[in-house]
From Swiss-Prot:
One Pfam family in the UniProt entry: Aldedh
EC number(s) per entry: 1.2.1.68
Quaternary structure note: Homodimer.
Protein name: Probable coniferyl aldehyde dehydrogenase
Residue ranges crossing the lipid bilayer per the database entry: none
PROSITE patterns, alphabetized: ALDEHYDE_DEHYDR_GLU
Enzyme class of the recorded protein, top EC level: oxidoreductase
Keyword NAD: yes
Length: 476
């Protein structure tokens, strides 16, 4: 009882501190509502220099949170894209900030029109555990480029990374500019209730609904980067080694704990055995052993490991054939496993997998594969393997997904010049590059008239002049 009271008191204290922090950031924004390009570039360069200097410490912190996280995967999937994204924005922010001239109709002349891009104010970012660095720095980059103040809520599942990032960012930003927030679920709930000018959430669809509901109380606009079951479609003619190798990379990275990882693969029925053989050969080439392999990342915690084992048990009990590619390794290293003969009533086909399990589903014709995808919630990503241009266009035009890779996996997320975001149940809104700048800016339309006022002819009292001139010229 005493422990419960102490916990509640601590929790309330953290929430009070959170609200006070938000108030300080709002006051700081009001004191400097339009930072110039020089200031924004300085922020971005300081962030880039910090990440570059502290990359080893970040690698070690993320490794501690996972108990075993491939250092190369952290470099490839977190540090490198973060650095590139910052560099990309810093080079272009001055151009992005320039007011955009717009056309004015003849009936409103003389006049001018433009769009001015203004910082929103205080931006909230809620970060998941699977890529704690990239999914905090990516939104931070866009928000800073747009001139905002930023509060970042780190996941309670990555405490080492959260503490380190809080310490590092405090070295280069005052707390009323950028602040990292730590805490358990109750702090996260309170965070989503703050009256941010924009809130970006990355995580599960089920949690995203709660975040959006909380934000709606303040009419806070949200960007939701969710997930779903992202399909890979293998065509009838693509060289199977090409498809198997690239799908295996997408499923192996971070042990499949990636929101855009291939969730299941659709393969022509006559080529299923070929796919299984090639996939097994590729994965075992990637990872000659599982235990103590520094290249193979662990499942983040026991709860997630238990969830994935539960999927395997459920599928086995309902008639699926399991093809594990290794024996289970130490430190929560769960082997890649192919699942054949799956059915829609299995949990592995009902929920986002978020791990190294890959159902293989046969199809007869391309239209059957597209129908299978379209009967399900719209995914965050879709992958198609086939070099026929007409078939590629058919897949693009006849399916909906947040993004697409043709003949590869994951890499669309690393492109700074294309937007990243979901559609429907997989999310809403976009960020990365210019789209990130736009998401975190208010595009303010500005109409300007000179002293001469031709608009007097449409002022009341209405008479013959408006009938003869205005209506005759413009109502047609």
């Amino acid at each position: 009882m005493v422990a419960d009271i102490a916990y509640l008191q601590q929790s309330q204290q953290e929430i009070n501190q959170l609200e006070a922090l938000f108030a300080r950031q709002r006051a700081a924004y009001l004191a400097q509502p339009m930072p110039d390009a020089t200031q924004r570039v300085q922020w971005l360069k300081a962030l880039r220099d910090l990440l570059f200097k502290e990359q080893q410490a970040l690698i070690e912190a993320i490794d501690r949170d996972f108990s075993a996280r491939s250092a190369d995967e952290t470099l490839l999937a977190e540090i490198m894209p973060s650095l590139h994204g910052i560099h990309y924005a810093a080079k272009r922010v001055k151009k992005w900030m320039k007011p955009a001239r717009r056309a004015v109709g003849l009936q409103f002349q003389p006049a001018s029109a433009q769009v001015v891009y203004q910082p929103l104010g205080v931006v909230g970012v809620i970060v998941p555990w699977n890529y704690p660095l990239f999914l905090s720095i990516g939104p931070l980059t866009g928000a800073l480029a747009a001139g905002n103040r930023v509060m970042i809520k780190m996941s309670e599942s990555t405490p080492a990374t959260g503490r380190l990032l809080k310490d590092l960012l405090a070295r280069i930003f005052p707390e009323d500019q950028v602040a990292v927030v730590l805490g358990e679920v109750d702090v996260g709930v309170a965070f989503s209730k703050l009256p941010f000018d924009h809130l970006l959430f990355t995580g599960a669809t089920s949690v995203g609904k709660h975040v959006m509901r909380a934000a709606a109380e303040n009419l806070t606009p949200v960007t939701l980067e969710l997930g779903g079951k992202s399909p890979a479609i293998v065509s009838d003619s693509v060289p199977m080694k090409d498809a198997a190798e690239r799908i295996a990379f997408g499923k192996s990275l971070n042990a499949g704990q990636t929101c855009v990882a291939p969730d299941y693969v659709l393969v022509p029925s006559r080529r299923v055995e070929e796919f299984v053989s090639q996939y097994k050969e590729v994965v075992q080439g990637f990872f000659p052993r599982l235990s103590d392999n520094p290249d193979y990342t662990a499942i983040i915690n026991e709860r997630q490991l238990g969830r994935l084992r539960g999927y395997l048990d459920d599928a086995r009990e309902k008639g699926a054939t399991l093809v594990p590619l290794f024996a289970e390794g130490q430190q929560r290293r769960l082997p890649q496993t192919l699942l054949l003969n799956v059915s829609d009533d299995m949990k592995v086909m009902q929920e986002e997998i978020f791990g190294p399990l890959l159902p293989v589903i046969p199809y007869e014709r391309l239209e059957d594969a597209l129908a299978y995808v379209n009967q399900r919630p719209r995914p965050l990503a879709l992958y198609y393997f086939g070099y026929d241009k007409a078939q590629q266009q058919r897949v693009l035009h006849e399916t909906h997904s947040g993004g697409v890779c043709l003949n590869d996996t994951l890499l669309h997320v690393a492109q700074d010049d294309i937007p990243f975001g979901g559609v429907g149940p997989s999310g809403m809104g976009h960020y990365h590059g210019h789209e990130g700048f736009l998401t975190f800016s208010k595009a303010k339309g500005v109409f300007s008239k000179p002293r001469f006022n031709a608009a007097r002819m449409i002022y009341p009292p209405y008479g013959k002049s408006i009938q003869k001139l205005v209506y005759k010229l413009f109502v047609r």
